[in-house]
A protein has these predicted regions:
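Glycine-rich, highly charged phosphate/nucleotide-binding loops
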Residues: 59-72
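N-terminal Rossmann-like dinucleotide-binding module
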Residues: 1-41, 45
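Donor/substrate-binding cores of folate-linked one-carbon enzymes
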Residues: 22, 28, 36, 86-208
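Short beta->alpha connector loops at strand-helix junctions that form conserved
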Residues: 54-59, 107
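A generic structural signal for well-ordered alpha-helical segments
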Residues: 46-47, 75, 97, 124
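Glycine-rich phosphate-binding loop signature in dinucleotide/nucleotide-binding domains
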Residues: 74-81
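A residue-level signal for conserved active-site and pocket-lining positions in enzyme catalytic cores
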Residues: 11, 33, 46, 83, ...
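Residue-level detector of anion-binding/catalytic polar loops
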Residues: 52, 81, 130
């Protein structure tokens, strides 16, 4: 029996595509793709893969609690076991997070707890760190503050301050982040679906991850 996931997006949907392509023969089914924007390129990717889509936009429903309530109902109707935030660029309400406690994961382009929030790649470059990376974590009610599942680091070459960098330099570094994201997120979902990920009952900050070989 397949492990049922839904993917929430806002923009290009490259991490959604990585899930579509990277889950392979894993017993995981993407049962729905929800977007916060009607013009998300990710919706086209989902439809091309034959996936069900829906839009939950604050432009249509400005009350965030009502919007998130409708989204939660939509997920429950599809018996979703895991909600994957793959470039979903909005904070979810505490009520939504409590409703799916321990069943929401997010991918973030930084080694948390450093550089949480928006513009994580820009923050990384502006600070001048020598090692960057990507984090997959459970979602709690804070800003990118939930328990960490997986992280992957990589070295950054010397670069000038972001204001002085050329577009090509920035694009090359952003592509490195994307490469890691597109590998790490499907791996995390596979591990969760296989029951290899668990939060320590005695210390909720600690996540046990069994090797995937």
């Amino acid at each position: 029996m397949s492990f049922r996931i839904a993917v929430l997006i806002s923009g290009e949907g490259s991490n959604l595509q990585a899930l579509i392509d990277g889950l392979g023969d894993a017993p995981v089914e993407i049962v729905g793709v929800g977007s916060s924007r009607a013009d998300s390129r990710g919706l086209e990717r989902a439809e091309a893969a034959g996936l069900e889509t829906a839009v939950f936009s604050l432009a249509d429903e400005p009350d965030r609690d009502k919007r998130d309530g409708a989204l939660a109902d939509w997920l429950d109707q599809r018996d979703v076991e895991l909600v994957v935030l793959a470039g979903f660029m909005e904070l979810l309400t505490p009520g939504f997070i409590r409703r799916f406690a321990g069943r929401i994961v997010n991918i973030h382009p930084a080694l948390l707890p450093s550089f949480a929030g928006l513009r994580a790649v820009a923050q990384t470059l502006e600070y001048g760190v020598k090692v960057a990376g990507v984090t997959v974590h459970f979602v709690d009610e804070g800003m990118d503050s939930g328990p960490i599942i997986l992280q992957e680091a990589f070295g950054l070459p010397y670069h000038r301050g972001i204001e002085a960098m050329g577009e090509g330099e920035i694009d090359a570094i952003e592509e490195r982040f994307h490469e890691v994201e597109h590998r790490l997120l499907p791996r995390a979902v596979r591990l969760i679906a296989a029951g290899r990920v668990s939060i320590d009952p005695d210390d909720s900050r600690q996540v046990r991850v069994e090797s995937d070989g």
